[in-house]
Design a protein with these regions (language model features):
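Hydrophobic alpha-helical segments characteristic of transmembrane helices
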Residues: 155-166
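Transmembrane signal-anchor hairpin modules in multi-pass inner-membrane enzymes, especially those
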Residues: 1-157, 178, 209-233
């Protein structure tokens, strides 16, 4: 169950515009939250996977021993403090926009109070929460090597397909994201409105394919096989 939900969420991250659209951000957040909940919340036996390792006490303690859990929790709490203590307020008029200072607690982290649809601290909180919930859920919920490999292959295939679409868009002179959605930024790539987001994602895909390559290469060497899945990478 964790493998399916987490894998679909990872694969979908290649195609739903990097969370720039509101519906895509909330879709990724829902998938990440569900992955995490399926990993740590108690589940009935019939819904607990073949190995019965989901939603038990050992998973919860495994989460507490994961350094990224505490790092992410600290960062999310920091962002919550910022969001709850705005030092500047965004103002708009027909002539443009500006910021005005507002009363705030000076010794606490602060932020700019803006529109959630555009960008503010709460939207940043949603983005970081989405990422950490998915990482926590996969770390706790994926216990078998076969499941981990399948998850990595899903990510690699989806990301590679997105990269190929980006290349085709570039050479075909596409003027819209995925040939259908207009973007205020003309320098989009694949399904990403901004190239810096695409680069970050493609670096993740490159690292994933490298891990898969060396894993399958070493396995082929140990078993004396002349080929293997690594040749596809």
């Amino acid at each position: 169950t964790v493998l399916f939900v987490g894998g679909v969420t990872l694969a979908a991250s290649s195609w739903i515009f990097g969370g720039v659209e509101m519906w895509s951000l909330h879709t990724l957040f829902a998938g990440s939250a569900l992955t995490f909940l399926l990993s740590v919340c108690p589940l009935p036996k019939w819904f607990n996977g073949r190995d019965g390792e989901h939603g038990n006490r050992r998973n919860f303690f495994r989460l507490l021993k994961f350094p990224v859990f505490w790092l992410g929790l600290f960062l999310l709490l920091y962002i919550i403090l910022q969001a709850s203590n705005p030092a500047w307020e965004l103002k708009r008029s027909d002539k443009g926009w500006w910021v005005e200072e507002v009363e705030h607690i000076t010794w606490l982290p602060s932020s700019v109070e803006g529109e959630y649809e555009k960008m503010n601290a709460f939207r940043v909180l949603a983005s970081f929460s989405m990422a950490f919930l998915l990482v926590w859920g996969l770390w706790v919920g994926i216990r078998r090597r076969r499941s981990a490999l399948l998850l990595l292959w899903m990510l690699a295939i989806s990301g590679t397909a997105m990269a190929m679409v980006g290349i085709i868009q570039k050479f075909s002179g596409a003027d819209a994201v995925l040939w259908s959605i207009e973007s205020a930024n003309p320098n989009f790539w694949g399904s990403f409105y901004y190239r810096n987001q695409a680069v970050g994602y493609l670096v993740l895909i490159l690292a994933t394919t490298a891990v898969l390559y060396f894993y399958h290469y070493n396995r082929s060497e140990k078993t004396g096989q002349s080929g293997g899945p690594h040749l596809l990478l």
